Swiss-Prot record:
This is Translationally-controlled tumor protein homolog. Coiled coil: none annotated. It comes from Cucumis melo (Muskmelon). The keyword Protein biosynthesis does not apply. Keywords: Calcium, Cytoplasm.
Length: 168
């Protein structure tokens, strides 16, 4: 299994269990999320509750909750929405922090192509949800989510050069 970590914070943000499609010259990975139901598991252990006097759930509050699989799996933390000005400020800080962490050709490609990726994201800002990794580290990678027209499940966008592949 491959896990993709944020180069800045080390937070796990994605794995190969979630296939991605490269867009914007490979600068952005697009991943389809899914709403799933978590909790409310009814376990039958073979006991006869009526014979044992335990017909009621005793103090168990096991509610079913709908979550987005990627957000739940990687414990992504949702951030407040932003306008274009705040978004540009945050993305510039991230680019400044990420660039020295990239090596040689990867760094050059990043410098040449990141502007196109930002221009791709900018018109979507009002429709995006913003997430960061579990540690909520300053200037770490942001994960963006939005709903394509007519979709009921969110699509996630990752800045690909900011991810480090780790074998588990």
């Amino acid at each position: 299994m491959l896990v993709y970590q944020d180069l800045v914070s080390g937070d796990e943000l994605l794995s190969d269990s979630f296939p991605y499609k490269e867009i914007e010259n490979g600068m952005i990975w697009e991943v389809e999320g899914k709403w799933v139901v978590k909790g409310a598991v009814d376990v039958d252990i073979g006991a006869n509750p009526s014979a044992e006097g335990g017909g009621e759930d005793e103090g168990v509050d096991d509610q079913a909750v709908k979550v987005v699989d990627i957000v739940d799996t990687f414990r992504l933390q949702e951030q407040p929405s932003m306008d274009k000005k705040v978004f540009l400020s945050c993305i510039k800080k991230y680019i400044k922090k990420l660039t020295p962490l990239l090596q040689g050709e990867q760094q050059e490609a990043f410098k040449n192509k990141i502007e196109g990726a930002v221009k791709y994201l900018l018109p979507k800002v009002k429709d995006l949800q913003f997430f960061v990794g579990e540690s909520m580290a300053d200037d770490s990678a942001m994960v963006f989510a939005y709903y394509k027209e007519g979709a009921t499940d969110p699509t996630f966008l990752y800045i690909a050069p900011g991810l480090k592949e780790v074998k588990c």
